[in-house]
């Protein structure tokens, strides 16, 4: 699920935050500059009369200085055009990188294409000549897998509802530890074995320790935004490789179709688990855990930086019921409105604060299942690049359409259904129609 977000915290921009990320959005005119000074007594009456005459002309900065909780529609369209294309590209790049890492690993490392085991969530084997029995086993595996996902999601919602934050943080930290240390060790070992690279165990352990420790700090505490994004991409790729290796072929395709339907229900249904998680977070005015979300802008949570004493005079927008449905982030985090500066006395040489950068958020589960689809196409598509490329393009087209619908409806949308549907259609049509057609043309030495 994804959406645009304005900010992730009700706090103003802090000194430590600006050291981690440079704001790229234009600065707004300060309130002091827009008001007449004490020495402009003769111009005060003229300024007030012009204010009455220019009621029809809407100045975006007037809202920021007066604290009026609203913006003209023209400014909203301008912001959509301004931030839309930029952040669509910023979302396409990590999705593409994650899928490239998975496909490159599948094509080069045989370990992830060898079938020597199954997950405990898919106990039914598909090693049977009967097509009906194989289809039945894949459906049963899918039911078990989706049931586990639903139960764990509801369990997470219950923990969050009863404020078991330490348990949730411990759960996420243990998962990150396993991915960044154990799975990275296995991955590096197989890569070194494939390319015949000699490596002693102390050096390997030291490299894995440094990699994992930096990742834990960046994901669960604080660090540069680019480094945090890189670690989230690596985690998604490692998890996708595990699914590709241990999910049976037919079960993988059925699970991909079922998980897209579940994503649709969980996000849009009023009693969906993710929607309930979002509503609880909005009631408490709290952010969702950043370890579950990829953000194209800084995900700023409480405790990551100290408050600047000079930023205590900010006024927040009042609660708006219509804004509640349109402020969900990619994994259920509320996107809080921007803070408006309260009018304060002007001081010479005072610089206006920079506006916080907007961004797009996408759940890590979307990264994982995008990569699973492309990786399965690369592993089971008889090594044909046309099938892999078709699935890759289909996912990007679906993601682009989802972002387009996001801009139209201005509400949170699930990111899996359109992309996964296009990917499945492109995979089976290319593998069963396009590839045989190309093979026939090549056998007759005909080129188009």
Curated annotation (Swiss-Prot):
Enzyme nomenclature, EC number: 3.4.23.-
Keyword Methyltransferase: no
GO molecular function annotation: aspartic endopeptidase activity, intramembrane cleaving; endopeptidase activity
Residues modified as Phosphoserine: 22, 25, 30
This protein's name: Presenilin-2
Region (Disordered): 1-62
Gene3D superfamilies: Presenilin (1.10.472.100)
Organism: Rattus norvegicus
One of the record's GO cellular component terms: protein-containing complex
Compartment annotation: Endoplasmic reticulum membrane; Golgi apparatus membrane
Any GO BP annotation: regulation of calcium import into the mitochondrion
Active site: 263, 366
Cytoplasmic-facing ranges: 1-87, 160-166, 222-223, 271-358, 410-413, 435-448
Residue intervals passing through the bilayer: 88-106, 139-159, 167-187, 201-221, 224-244, 250-270, 359-379, 389-409
Chain's role: Probable catalytic subunit of the gamma-secretase complex, an endoprotease complex that catalyzes the intramembrane cleavage of integral membrane proteins such as Notch receptors and APP (amyloid-beta precursor protein). Requires the other members of the gamma-secretase complex to have a protease activity. May play a role in intracellular signaling and gene expression or in linking chromatin to the nuclear membrane. May function in the cytoplasmic partitioning of proteins.
Keywords: Endoplasmic reticulum, Golgi apparatus, Hydrolase, Membrane, Notch signaling pathway, Phosphoprotein, Protease, Transmembrane, Transmembrane helix
Chain ranges for the short sequence motif PAL as given in the UniProt record: 414-416
Lumenal side: 107-138, 188-200, 245-249, 380-388
Family to which this protein belongs: Belongs to the peptidase A22A family.
Residue ranges annotated as intramembrane: 414-434
Reported modifications of this chain: Phosphorylated on serine residues.
Comment text on domains: The PAL motif is required for normal active site conformation.
Subunit structure of this chain's protein: Homodimer. Component of the gamma-secretase complex, a complex composed of a presenilin homodimer (PSEN1 or PSEN2), nicastrin (NCSTN), APH1 (APH1A or APH1B) and PEN2. Such minimal complex is sufficient for secretase activity, although other components may exist. Interacts with DOCK3. Interacts with HERPUD1, FLNA and FLNB.
Biased composition, class Polar residues, residue ranges: 19-33
Record membrane topology: Multi-pass membrane protein
Lineage of the species this protein comes from: Eukaryota, Metazoa, Chordata, Craniata, Vertebrata
């Amino acid at each position: 699920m994804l959406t645009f977000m304005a900010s992730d915290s009700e706090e103003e921009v802090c000194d430590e935050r600006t050291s981690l990320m440079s704001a790229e959005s234009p600065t707004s005119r300060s309130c002091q500059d827009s008001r007449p000074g004490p020495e402009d007594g003769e111009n005060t009456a003229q300024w007030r009369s012009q204010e009455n005459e220019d009621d029809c002309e809407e100045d975006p900065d007037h809202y920021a200085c007066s604290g009026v909780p609203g913006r003209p529609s023209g400014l909203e369209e301008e912001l959509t055009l301004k931030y839309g294309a930029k952040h669509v590209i910023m979302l396409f790049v990590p999705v593409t990188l994650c899928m490239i890492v998975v496909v490159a690993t599948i094509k080069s490392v045989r370990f992830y294409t060898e079938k020597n085991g199954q997950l405990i969530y898919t106990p039914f084997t598909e090693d049977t000549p009967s097509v009906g029995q194989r289809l039945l086993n894949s459906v049963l595996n899918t039911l078990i897998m989706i049931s586990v996902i639903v139960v764990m999601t509801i369990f997470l919602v219950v923990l969050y509802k009863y404020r078991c934050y330490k348990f949730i943080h411990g759960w996420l930290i243990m998962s990150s530890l396993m991915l960044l240390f154990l799975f990275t060790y296995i991955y590096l070992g197989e890569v070194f074995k494939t390319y015949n690279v000699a490596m002693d165990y102390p050096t390997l352990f030291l490299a894995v320790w440094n990699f994992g420790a930096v990742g834990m700090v960046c994901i669960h505490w604080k660090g540069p935004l680019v480094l945090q994004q890189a670690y989230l991409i690596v985690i998604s790729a490692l998890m996708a490789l595990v699914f590709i290796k241990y999910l049976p072929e037919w079960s993988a395709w059925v699970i991909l179709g079922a998980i897209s339907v579940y994503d649709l229900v969980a996000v849009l249904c009023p009693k969906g688990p993710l929607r309930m998680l979002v509503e609880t977070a909005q009631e408490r005015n709290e952010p969702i855990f950043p370890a579950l979300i990829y953000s194209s802008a800084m995900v700023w949570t409480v405790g990551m930086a100290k408050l600047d004493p000079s930023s205590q005079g900010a006024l927040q927008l009042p609660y708006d019921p219509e804004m509640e449905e349109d402020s969900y982030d990619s994994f259920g985090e509320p996107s809080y409105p921007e803070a408006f500066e309260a009018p304060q006395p002007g001081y010479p040489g005072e610089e206006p604060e920079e506006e916080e950068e907007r961004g797009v958020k996408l759940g890590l589960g979307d990264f994982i299942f995008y990569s699973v689809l492309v990786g399965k196409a690369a592993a089971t598509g008889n090594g044909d690049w046309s099938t892999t490329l078709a699935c890759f393009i289909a996912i990007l087209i679906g993601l682009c359409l989802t972002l387009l619908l996001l801009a139209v409806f201005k509400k949170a949308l699930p990111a899996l259904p359109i992309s996964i549907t296009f990917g499945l259609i492109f995979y089976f049509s290319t593998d069963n129609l396009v590839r045989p057609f190309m093979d026939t043309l090549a056998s007759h030495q005909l080129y188009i």
